[in-house]
């Protein structure tokens, strides 16, 4: 079952400019790193603002799964789960369209297993099982 909202994902056209802006607004940078993804690396940052984690990327991991690409702005919600395999099967059985099948990711935030879905109405969300956390 879904435990909680872990973060909101946002695509930005200019990561440095948005980080500067968000710090001025009151955000704290928790982590700035790169995420190895297949044959590429994605720059990202995690900030905390108003008690919420925001994960900022110039490109989102599911970009190639969305016709026409993904516009800058809010892209998806990330929900923490205890058992990714069980939750993946449950959401798929309920009609969630799989965008990214379960996979292992590791970077400055720690290690996780993740999967991405699109709801019947088009909402994109991620389910994530934290294996090791290096950020609060």
Predicted regions: what is each one?
Residues 1, 4-14, 35, 43-48, 66-136, ...:
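Vicinal oxygen chelate
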Residues 59-62, 130-132:
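Acetyl-CoA-dependent GNAT
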Residues 55-56, 126:
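Conserved beta-strand in the GNAT
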Residues 2, 9-53:
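Core segments of cupin and vicinal oxygen chelate
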Residues 38-39, 57, 63, 107-108:
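Short secondary-structure capping/turn micro-motifs that flank functional sites
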Residues 50-54, 61-62, 84-85:
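Short, charged/polar surface micro-motifs in flexible loops or helix N-caps
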